[in-house]
């Protein structure tokens, strides 16, 4: 049978007209080797660093290294089913995670999947895990206070919205306790109608036991703090890749609030374990080790994360993201590699000492080493005036107490200085889960620096403090509102405080 050229032409033309464009064009590569969560893949020469790849088993991976003939992929999660020869497909996208108010009250894993049994998210906003930090022109100076509810911090080491403040100390010194107290303190702002005062919290648990995080979540639920908090969990049993991703996921969730004219607080607990997870990945990728076997870019690992915390300017909506990274030290050695790195990145550090903790001073804050570089600008004038006097009194007390150790005879003024310093130190002690509103902190410290506790026994200081605040709440709530509204201690407020405190001290003396 002889076909005519015109018939062949018509048949081909008809076939081409019926042919749709390729609905999906995918680049496929193959696994050459797999081990310890690292897959070497051949055939994806166009893949880019940070791209998400899809394995034929359904598992995902991130491109970490690009080499001449192959790429190295870090498997997200368990790669048990991936074998040599398994197909790998490009997705041409970077990792995105769900964000938004829908995540409040939920517990998610390192890539944003819910793990609390409350079902999937309905309509979340997906954001990139890795984004550039806001530029200098988008930022504003830190000028709003981030109230922690902890007297020693709000007075001596103040934190502002958009700041990065490191919490550092040995294990079991109360680092997580401080972070949780700060979350609990935000509850009073969420009960008010002022949206600008509300702070949404993200707690990122890296390399912790699931049982520990479960207790923490239970506490947040009991106190009602879970309503404005999201917990991102990458436990000790998770793969190093998930522990590496968890802080960036938490940061992306916080950035949703920052970029939508709201305030967010993200706590990274802790970045020591995050650095260890990254070290593990880097050594498996055969990257050259540097100091303490960490890779050379470990500084960039944390700087690109913490630089995303910012206070945005008016043109960008005045939102903020505050970061509180936690770092665990060994034997109070702050000169180790990771602690020094993060100290140099952050805007200050809260240093907790095990010696103070064992003495019963909680929070076990070393005021001498702790510092806040930008938070003082955010302090209200009332607290700033009180805090300057407290710092001076405490500095003189520590100096005089050290001098008294030599057994020298002290005059009456020096003894008075030591006695007042002891009472001020006692005033700064605080139980866990008991955050103080700023107006109550101001009243307590005002009483301390003006000598109203000088005749009170040190063991009775906490009792005096509780009774005094109760007296103010019942008989003089207006003075508290006045302090909050004016944000400073005027002569009128000062005279009122003196009058009320004198009446209270007199009533105590009469009772005793």
From Swiss-Prot:
EC number(s) given by UniProt: 7.1.2.2
Chain sites annotated for binding ATP: 169-176
A GO MF label: ATP binding
Site note Required for activity, residues: 370
InterPro entries the record matches: ATP_synth_asu-like_sf, ATP_synth_asu_C, ATP_synth_asu_C_sf, ATP_synth_F1_a_nt-bd_dom, ATP_synth_F1_asu, ATPase_a/bsu_AS, ATPase_F1/V1/A1_a/bsu_N, ATPase_F1/V1/A1_a/bsu_N_sf
Pfam families attached to this UniProt entry: ATP-synt_ab, ATP-synt_ab_C, ATP-synt_ab_N
Keyword DNA-binding belongs to the record: no
Recorded topology in the membrane: Peripheral membrane protein
Keywords attached to this entry: ATP synthesis, ATP-binding, Cell inner membrane, Cell membrane, CF(1), Hydrogen ion transport, Ion transport, Membrane, Nucleotide-binding, Translocase, Transport
Record's catalysed reaction(s): ATP + H2O + 4 H(+)(in) = ADP + phosphate + 5 H(+)(out)
Localization in the cell: Cell inner membrane
Enzyme class at the top of the EC tree: translocase
GO annotations of cellular component type: plasma membrane; proton-transporting ATP synthase complex
PROSITE patterns for this protein: ATPASE_ALPHA_BETA
Function: Produces ATP from ADP in the presence of a proton gradient across the membrane. The alpha chain is a regulatory subunit.
Annotated family: Belongs to the ATPase alpha/beta chains family.
Assembly: F-type ATPases have 2 components, CF(1) - the catalytic core - and CF(0) - the membrane proton channel. CF(1) has five subunits: alpha(3), beta(3), gamma(1), delta(1), epsilon(1). CF(0) has three main subunits: a(1), b(2) and c(9-12). The alpha and beta chains form an alternating ring which encloses part of the gamma chain. CF(1) is attached to CF(0) by a central stalk formed by the gamma and epsilon chains, while a peripheral stalk is formed by the delta and b chains.
Protein name: ATP synthase subunit alpha
Native organism: Orientia tsutsugamushi (strain Boryong) (Rickettsia tsutsugamushi)
């Amino acid at each position: 049978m002889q076909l005519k050229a015109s018939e062949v032409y018509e048949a081909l033309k008809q076939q081409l007209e019926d042919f749709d464009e390729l609905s999906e064009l995918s680049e496929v590569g193959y696994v050459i080797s797999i081990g310890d969560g690292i897959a070497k893949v051949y055939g994806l020469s166009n893949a880019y660093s940070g791209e998400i790849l899809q394995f034929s088993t359904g598992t995902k991976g991130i491109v970490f290294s690009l080499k001449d003939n192959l790429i190295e992929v870090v498997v997200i999660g368990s790669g048990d089913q991936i074998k040599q020869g398994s197909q790998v497909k490009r997705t041409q996208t970077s990792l995105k995670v769900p964000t938004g108010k829908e995540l409040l009250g939920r517990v998610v894993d390192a890539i944003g999947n819910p793990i609390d049994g409350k079902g999937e998210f309905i309509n979340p906003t997906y954001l990139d895990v890795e984004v550039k930090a806001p530029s200098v022109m988008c930022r504003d100076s830190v000028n709003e206070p981030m109230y922690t509810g902890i007297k020693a911090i709000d007075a001596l080491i103040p934190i502002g919205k958009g700041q990065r403040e490191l919490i550092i100390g040995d294990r079991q010194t109360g680092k997580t306790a401080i972070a949780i107290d700060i979350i609990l303190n935000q509850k009073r702002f969420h009960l008010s109608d002022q949206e600008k005062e509300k702070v949404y919290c993200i707690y990122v648990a890296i390399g912790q036991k699931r049982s520990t995080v479960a207790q923490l979540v239970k506490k947040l639920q009991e106190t009602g703090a879970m309503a404005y908090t999201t917990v991102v969990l990458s436990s000790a049993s998770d793969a190093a890749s998930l522990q590496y991703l968890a802080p960036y996921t938490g940061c992306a969730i916080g950035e949703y609030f920052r970029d939508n004219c709201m305030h967010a607080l993200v706590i990274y607990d802790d970045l020591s374990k995050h650095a260890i997870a990254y070290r593990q990945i880097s050594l498996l990728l055969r990257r050259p080790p540097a100091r303490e076997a960490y890779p050379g870019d470990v500084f960039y690992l944390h700087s690109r994360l913490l630089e995303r915390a910012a206070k945005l300017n008016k043109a960008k909506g005045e939102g903020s993201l505050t970061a509180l990274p936690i770092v665990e030290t060994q034997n109070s050695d702050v000169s180790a590699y990771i602690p020094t790195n993060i100290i140099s990145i952050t805007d200050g550090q809260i240093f907790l000492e095990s010696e103070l903790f064992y003495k019963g001073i909680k929070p076990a804050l070393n005021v001498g080493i702790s510092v806040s570089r930008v938070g003082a600008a955010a302090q209200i004038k009332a607290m700033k005036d009180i805090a300057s006097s407290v710092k001076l009194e405490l500095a003189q007390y520590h100096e005089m107490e050290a001098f008294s150790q030599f057994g020298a005879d002290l005059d009456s003024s020096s003894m008075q200085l030591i006695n007042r310093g002891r009472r001020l130190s006692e005033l700064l002690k605080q139980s866990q889960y008991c955050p103080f509103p700023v107006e109550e902190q101001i009243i307590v410290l005002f009483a301390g620096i003006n000598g109203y506790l000088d005749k009170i026994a040190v063991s009775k200081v906490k009792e005096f403090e509780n009774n005094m605040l109760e007296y103010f709440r019942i008989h003089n709530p207006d003075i508290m509102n006045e302090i909050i509204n004016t944000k400073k201690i005027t002569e009128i407020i000062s005279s009122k405080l003196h009058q009320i405190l004198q009446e209270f001290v007199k009533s105590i003396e009469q009772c005793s």
